[in-house]
Amino acid sequence: MIALIQRVRRAEVRVGDRVTGAIDAGLLALVCAERGDTDAVADKLLAKVLGYRVFSDAAGKMNLPVQNIDGAGRAGGLLLVSQFTLAADTNSGLRPSFTPAAPPDEGKRLFDYFVAAARAKHAIVETGEFGAEMQVSLVNDGPVTFWLQTRA
């Protein structure tokens, strides 16, 4: 399972003219399930997303997770957006292959599981809409972007 996380000042996702999720300071995570991923793999990735230290402490070092973005216990927002294209195989030719991505039904199940688990562990969780054409707007903070990937 893959998450491309970006530290943001704010971010929102729209489907058509409807905002489906919006956060202030926190993380935007583009999330993709790969073939063979399980709930355990999703749990492992979520622990990494929630614990990854990408926010600056008082000394200016990236030392704080989204659950404590100011060092005083304030949680940042977590905007989760499904994006199967992260699993693309780009090794041959000029057209990506999406064979490594989980099939749509399994991808949706794992994304929904990931969102539910995130909501159980984190105060501020917003989402896009699985399988929809979405427009994502964000203001990067840094920019700070990391590719996180977990496997069984």
From Swiss-Prot:
Gene Ontology MF, one: D-tyrosyl-tRNA(Tyr) deacylase activity
InterPro entries in UniProt: Daa-tRNA_deacyls_DTD (IPR003732), DTD-like_sf (IPR023509)
GO BP terms: D-amino acid catabolic process
Entry keyword annotation includes RNA-binding: yes
Keywords assigned: Cytoplasm, Hydrolase, RNA-binding, tRNA-binding
Reaction it catalyzes: glycyl-tRNA(Ala) + H2O = tRNA(Ala) + glycine + H(+); a D-aminoacyl-tRNA + H2O = a tRNA + a D-alpha-amino acid + H(+)
Pfam families: Tyr_Deacylase (PF02580)
EC number(s) stated in the UniProt entry for this protein: 3.1.1.96
Record bears the keyword Ubl conjugation: no
Main localization, broad class: cytoplasm
Subcellular location: Cytoplasm
Example of a GO cellular component annotation carried by this entry: cytoplasm
Entry note about domains: A Gly-cisPro motif from one monomer fits into the active site of the other monomer to allow specific chiral rejection of L-amino acids.
Classification via PANTHER family: D-AMINOACYL-TRNA DEACYLASE 1 (PTHR10472:SF5), D-TYROSYL-TRNA TYR DEACYLASE (PTHR10472)
Annotated function: An aminoacyl-tRNA editing enzyme that deacylates mischarged D-aminoacyl-tRNAs. Also deacylates mischarged glycyl-tRNA(Ala), protecting cells against glycine mischarging by AlaRS. Acts via tRNA-based rather than protein-based catalysis; rejects L-amino acids rather than detecting D-amino acids in the active site. By recycling D-aminoacyl-tRNA to D-amino acids and free tRNA molecules, this enzyme counteracts the toxicity associated with the formation of D-aminoacyl-tRNA entities in vivo and helps enforce protein L-homochirality.
Binding partners and assembly: Homodimer.
The family this protein is said to belong to: Belongs to the DTD family.
Protein name (Swiss-Prot/TrEMBL): D-aminoacyl-tRNA deacylase
Organism: Paraburkholderia phymatum (strain DSM 17167 / CIP 108236 / LMG 21445 / STM815)
Gene (UniProt): dtd
